[in-house]
């Protein structure tokens, strides 16, 4: 008859103690003890947006909000040069018929915007527009001509 294995015959490895305060996910960085506020000090604009289409629409964090799906109805002129005030790699989803408020912040850097729906393809900053760059009015006319919905209500500047 075989003998039962004993603890002495099969020693267990010593348990390692984990310092949970220093723990971080693989590849992650701990930048500060306190939460980090995104877009700190940037002006914010709040708009009411309604999905008039029959399909869900999802908008990513760094999409030029002026150029989002043509079936989203909001004051597009107030969204010129702005993006969602949400963490990178996240999105806001609008189901058909949904109406919700979104908060927008200006793009940083030189504020040149290209691609998306090709409504701007140039500088999106405030102030005088260089002659060779499209301006807010031209982009708004282009959006209207291409059937992008807009309304003049539902926007406010947040402090």
UniProtKB/Swiss-Prot annotation:
Protein name as annotated: Urease subunit beta 2
Residue intervals passing through the bilayer: none
Subunit and interaction comment: Heterotrimer of UreA (gamma), UreB (beta) and UreC (alpha) subunits. Three heterotrimers associate to form the active enzyme.
Cited Gene3D superfamilies: Urease, beta subunit
Enzyme Commission (EC) number: 3.5.1.5
NCBIfam families the record matches: PRK13203.1, urease_beta
Keyword entries, A-Z: Cytoplasm, Hydrolase
Region Disordered, annotated ranges: 1-23
Family (UniProt): Belongs to the urease beta subunit family.
């Amino acid at each position: 008859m075989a003998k039962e294995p004993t603890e002495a015959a099969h020693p267990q490895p010593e348990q390692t103690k984990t310092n949970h305060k220093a723990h971080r996910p693989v590849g992650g960085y701990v930048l500060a003890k306190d939460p980090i506020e995104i877009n700190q000090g940037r002006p914010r604009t709040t708009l009411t947006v309604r999905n008039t289409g029959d399909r869900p629409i999802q908008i990513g964090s760094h999409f030029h909000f002026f150029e989002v799906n043509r079936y989203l109805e909001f004051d597009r002129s107030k969204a010129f040069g702005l993006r969602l005030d949400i963490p990178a790699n996240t999105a806001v989803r609008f189901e058909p018929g949904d109406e919700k408020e979104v908060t927008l912040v200006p793009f940083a850097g030189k504020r040149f915007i290209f691609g998306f729906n090709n409504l701007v393809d140039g500088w999106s900053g405030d102030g005088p527009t260089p002659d060779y760059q499209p301006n807010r009015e031209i982009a708004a006319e282009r959006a209207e001509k291409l059937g992008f919905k807009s309304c003049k209500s539902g926007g406010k500047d947040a402090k």
